[in-house]
Amino acid sequence: MLMVPNIAILSGGFSCEREISLMSGKAVKKALDSLSYNAIEIDVDSNIAQKLKKTNPALAFIALHGPYGEDGCIQGLLEILGIKYTHSEVMASAVAMNKVMSKHIFHSLNIDTPRGYVISREDVLKNNIKVDYPYVLKPINEGSSIGVHMIFSHEDYLELKNNSSTIMEKMIIEEYIPGIELHTAVLLNEAIGTMEIRPKNKFYDYEAKYTDGFAEHIFPAEIPNNIYRITLEHALKVHQFLGCKTVSRSDFRYNPQNNTLKMLEVNTHPGFTELSLVPEIAKLTRGIDFNELVKIIVEDSLHHRNIRDQADVEQCY
């Protein structure tokens, strides 16, 4: 009789994306239960190391989003504890989460990305800004469009300044790219499809991402064939260059007025509910339903993930 592995679903955590993480965790738990895995949900807190030692899972399914969850922190802890885990490893997670580092990677791969730079809170409040309207102000290490400000006019800037609590000490400011929002899924080292998003709001914000009916999903994206092909090529190129594992999602903006495509970011831990983009693309392109997608991620992580044995690490004397 085959042993069924114990799987710890890590969700919750400390970030602003906690609620979304809990939703992802519950969706994964439901899928794993239906697949007859032994699954337990763990709400990640400061005692996570002790919880993992007590649970001793064969695999940790990372359903965390945002800081500490997809930036290499939890991955590093799992490496130290010798526990296999899903999604990307430490370095890929850390670099992809940092929008400044990501831009350097995109440039090195000759992939266009919006012009931008790191700006201090002080310079934002003094309006010492070197980018013309419209522009985008966003955190360096956040996801789900949390803390993102679309500034189309001086009136928008004044509103931001009057509600300055969301302006962090260091942020990234970018030119605004008008046009079409695109998301490309990579699964098992293959770019499987690109979806177009048409939000009901001005942009694809937190509400539009996680509220049914606030955005229209168009598949395949209604863009020129050559642009569609380039989204697939760029998403796979970045996925492979960073060393991403199993699954990732790359985000783009396409401006049909001047036929330019800009890569915004790569997400190593994309949202993972049945309404999320990667599961939807997998279903539409490969006929893979949510439960099967969860199984693919679990099996790939169990059988193709090597955790370094501490005994193999070279000792320094």
From Swiss-Prot:
Q: What subcellular locations does the record give?
A: Cytoplasm
- Record-listed Mg(2+) 2 binding positions: 265, 267
Which intervals hold domain ATP-grasp? Answer: 103-299
Q: Describe the reaction catalysed, as an equation.
A: 2 D-alanine + ATP = D-alanyl-D-alanine + ADP + phosphate + H(+)
Does this UniProt record's set of keywords contain Manganese?
yes
Q: Which GO terms describe its cellular component?
A: cytoplasm
Record flagged with keyword GTP-binding: no
Coiled coil feature spans:
none
Q: Which family is it part of?
A: Belongs to the D-alanine--D-alanine ligase family.
Role played? Cell wall formation.
The molecule here is called D-alanine--D-alanine ligase
Query: Encoded by which gene?
Result: ddl
